Regions:
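Conserved alpha-helical substructure of the radical SAM core
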Residues: 2-153, 164-165
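Conserved phosphate-donor/acceptor-positioning beta-strand/loop module used by diverse small-molecule
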Residues: 156-158
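Conserved nucleotide-binding/hydrolysis micro-motifs of P-loop NTPases
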Residues: 161
């Protein structure tokens, strides 16, 4: 797969001040928590506490694809219009600006993360799809798969001053 520039530039290169668009007609962004597990044990995080001593947010550690697809399908009210729809519906409806794969766990641990990104992109669930990750599980194949699936941005979270503190 060829390289593609991925940066933090705003959609269409334009930024609008939040004060100009409030109140919003739709949610600005949705945070999706695909997994409740992590490959790190950062001192500030609930995953550093022994499993027996911490309450689970959910009974299932991994979000199943059926539930995920239902959530994405339910977001259709905020879907990005196609070019044809934009021509016939003027002005285009407000859309969800961003879908973030993040949360109480490491999203790249989900076995179907590439398919999750692909499904969200196919459904035009948001203008921007991104993942917040600690980066430890990134491989060339995974990066290629995520980019091919339509991921717009990967954000690496560094939460420490040195390697020992980070791990």
């Amino acid at each position: 797969m060829g390289a593609r520039r991925i940066d933090g530039q705003a959609v269409n290169g334009e930024r609008r001040r939040l004060a100009e668009v409030i109140p919003l007609d739709t949610p600005y962004a949705i945070a999706m928590f695909p997994i409740y597990a992590c490959n790190f044990k950062c001192s500030y995080c609930i995953h550093s506490i022994d499993v027996k001593q911490r309450p689970h947010v959910v009974d299932k550690v991994v979000m199943d694809m059926g539930l995920y697809k239902k959530i994405i399908d339910d977001l259709q009210a905020f879907r990005i219009p196609s070019t044809e729809e934009t021509i016939h519906n003027s002005p285009p409806p407000e859309v969800l600006k961003a879908l973030h794969f993040a949360g109480l766990g490491e999203p790249l641990m989900h076995p179907d993360i590439v398919e999750m990104v692909r499904y969200a992109k196919e459904q035009r669930a948001a203008r921007v799809l991104d993942i917040v990750t600690n980066g430890a599980l990134l491989t060339e194949n995974l990066i290629d798969g995520l980019v091919a699936a339509g991921l717009d941005r990967i954000r690496i979270s560094l939460q420490g001053l040195d390697a020992n503190m980070y791990r």
